[in-house]
Amino acid sequence: MKIYILGAGAIGSLFGGLLANAGEDVLLIGRDPHVSAINEKGLKIVGIKDLNVKVEATTRVPEEKPDLIVLATKSYSTIEALKSARHIVKGSWVLSIQNGIGNEDKIIEFGGKAIGGITTNGAMVEAPGVIKWTGKGVTIIGLYPQGKEKFIEKVADVFNSADIETHVSENIISWIWAKAIVNSAINPIGTLLEVKNKVIRENDFLLSMAMEVVKEGCRVALQNGIEFDVPPMDLFFQTLEQTRENYNSMLQDIWRGKKTEVDYINGKIVEYAKAVNLEAPMNLLLWGLIKGKEALEGKK
């Protein structure tokens, strides 16, 4: 399968590297110095697996369309990425494996055929051309917002053959919301206190607060017509257990002096609450506190 990874950061490079290693025709689209390092020495994957993969990388979007575009940018870069790839997005299958709510809607606005996706795999860029696979997780994909499609079954088969455990859902929008709700509770609390995820699980005050954030997100989702395949509270406890030793991605962004994705997680939950005349005070508070922390960190 001819696959372009649009946004060759940590997760994008991990998926692209594993797919290329399995013999798929992969092109990583990203930024220097990461792209240059991959073209010079190959893509090195360390951690869960140790691989050195020969894979093509570029900073420019090609003219030719692939079979599948995997969108793996940060959510705040979605529009910029889709604009740069407008000529290949239109009429093409585009799979989002991003955090947050609303990325798939943007794909549709640009004329793409949207496949929703979530992944619990963990990865980080250790150095240009080097990706650390920090946690082996599960990927769930499906026709957005709901439904069946034979091509998506084929994508899942390709991913599974590349050691990316993948399942297909006919209700992918519910998984996107469920993951966003879990992230809305764990990420801001872990970021504000600068602690590993296990601290939230082990501290009664933090755990009860995080659980209230999950409940609030569920109320907003249900009022917006989302029907969950799996209760987000179950996913919340499962995530805390599986990522006990992790510093969450929002905190890692803050430490690197980068913008976080809070606007597309807590911010979106607040936005959807307003749309159905609900209030989401805990999400509103966490959203504001993270935006404040972003601004303060930026001034250091």
Swiss-Prot record:
Keywords: Coenzyme A biosynthesis, Cytoplasm, NAD, NADP, Oxidoreductase. The keyword NADP applies. Coiled coil: none annotated. InterPro entries: 6-PGluconate_DH-like_C_sf, 6PGD_dom2, ApbA, Ketopantoate_reductase, KPA_reductase, KPR_N, NAD(P)-bd_dom_sf. The keyword NADP applies. Pathway: Cofactor biosynthesis; coenzyme A biosynthesis. NCBIfam families: apbA_panE, PRK06522.2-3. Belongs to the ketopantoate reductase family. This is 2-dehydropantoate 2-reductase. It comes from Pyrococcus abyssi (strain GE5 / Orsay).
